[in-house]
Structure formats: structure tokens, C-alpha cells
From Swiss-Prot:
Signal sequence bounds: none
Cellular component, GO, one term: cytoplasm
Low complexity: compositionally biased ranges: 23-32
Provenance organism: Schizosaccharomyces pombe (strain 972 / ATCC 24843) (Fission yeast)
Entry annotated with the keyword Coiled coil: yes
Regions annotated as coiled coil: 135-223
Principal place of residence: cytoplasm
Region (Disordered): 1-32
Keywords: Coiled coil, Cytoplasm, Cytoskeleton
Subcellular location: Cytoplasm; Cytoplasm, Cytoskeleton, Microtubule organizing center, Spindle pole body
UniProt protein name: Uncharacterized protein C1685.04
Keyword Chloroplast tagged: no
Amino acid sequence: MKQEYIPLDEFPNKSNEGMLNDEGTSSSGLSTRTRSLELFDNMEESGSFPKVERKIQSLLDELAEVLFQSKQPNDLTRIRKAIAEQLQLWCQACQENADLYRSQQRKLKSRWDSQTDILSQIESTKASLAEVHKAEEISNLKTSITHLDEEIQILQEKLAIVTNQRNTLVKRLQTYDNLEKKKALSMEDRLLTLQEQYDAHANVSSLEKRMEVLKKREDLLRLMVGQALPGMQFFQRLIHQIQAVETKLISILGPTSLSEAALPPLTDVQRTSVLSLLTSTLHSLESARQIADSNTWKPIIVCLELEIVYFENMLTAITSTPVSS
């Protein structure tokens, strides 16, 4: 069951859990750098987009550098927005490829219909040709001629009448023979032409297999886009909430206070307020990470782990800062 998203401000204050250990990893024991390297390992079958994915990876590395090496903290908003924009581009690319696969399927379907129609014509022509060869009229005429020949020998007095009948029937036979021969030749030529047309292109079975592959790719990409869009909305809301927390911290500690080295001495009231805000924020981030884990939003999981470590470090720094008189 997927977890429901809860805004940062609605979480109750809890004591900090999951502080960094001596080796710079979270309490889960998973290095955020290692997890970021695994983001796009399983996307080959759906048609990945290396340029966008490498850009996302680069932004994640840059975010980690800014958060943990105290370099240009003012770039946090830019980096977070850039990550969101790249994820949106990735979704759009998936959508465009899915539409392309659908277009290719339609073209193959048209060719499939054409080949199927040719097959139908071939079968119909074969059936008609078989009927021509089995026509009973030719057999009946030949039988009548044989009977008349026998009657000529027996009934000499009726020779003239029988001869006329025979001549008439012979002419009819010749007429039928000529017509049927022409019809048979025409049908044989038609059959040969249709067979050549069919053999000149991919057969129906091959087209069906290619259509099936394209349909699977389209379905997979559309599924990935459908799964990624909620993650995008979730990540954008999270960015706004983190920025709101930082604004509150700056209002309490001063404009340069987000760097650990620049923390000013705090009064007891300031210290209590900041610790409460950081503890609540960490609890909210942990819950958000569980939601991302349950939905397999890998880039967002890495971002959340970086933010958690960043706020845990700040909490540690605030805890060790002496109280100002």
C-alpha cells in the first residue's frame, strides 16, 4: 500500500533519529553516493535517455557537494529546480517515444492489413481455379458426343440429324473449351502476380511480432510516465517546503547561518526554536523518503537522503553551539 504524503508543517516534533555515523553515511548504512549510481541501471528495456539521465546524476552530485562541503549554499534552490526540470524533460521524452512507437504500430498495421488482403485474394483465386478444373459441363458434353457416335453407327437412317446434332455439340464444346482455357490462364497469371506481391514484403507473422514488440515498449513507457508524474508533483511540493524551512532558519539565525562554519552564538530561546524546527523537518523528510521508497522514485530518494544528512549535520552543529548570554 502506498503511503499518503504529509506536508512538513503537519508532523509533530520528534527526537532526531538516524544521525550520521563516523563514516559519513546515514543510519540505514547506505551511502547516498552508491545509491545515486544505481538510479538508471534497469531502464534499458524501456528505451533510456542517457543525456537527460547523466544530467540528473550530475545535478545530484552537485547537490551533495553543496550540502556537505559548504560550497555556495545559495545554489541549493537552483540545483533543486534543475533536478525537477530534468525529471520533467525525462518524462516528456518517454511520452514522445511512446507516441512514436504507436505511430510505427499504425504503419505496420496498414501493411499487415494489405498483406492479409492479398492472402485472402490468393485463397479465393485458388478456390475459383479448382472449380474451373472440376466443371461438370465439359464432362457432360464429351459424354453426349460419345453417345451420339454410337447412335450414328446403329441408326444410319438418322445419320443426317444426328450428324447435325453432333456438329452443334462439337462447336459448343470448342466454345466452352476456349473460354475456360482463357479464364484458367488469366486466373493463373493473377495467382502468380499476387504471390509475387506477397513474397516481396515481410510476411504477416513477422509483422505481427514487430507490432507486438512496439506495443510492449509503448505500454512500458506510458506506465513509467504515469508512475513518474506523481513523483514530480511530490518533489516540487517538497522543494517549496524545504525552502520555507530554510527561510525560517535564516530569519532566526541570520542570512549566513545555513553554513555550519558561520553559525552565530544562540540564545536559549533561539536554540530551542531552531532545534524544534530541525527535528520536525527531519521527521518529515524521513516520512517523505519512505513514501519515495514505496513508489520507487529513485532520483527523489537520493535527493531526500542528501537533504536528511544535510539537516542532520545542521542539527549536530546547532546542538554543539554554545548558548549566548
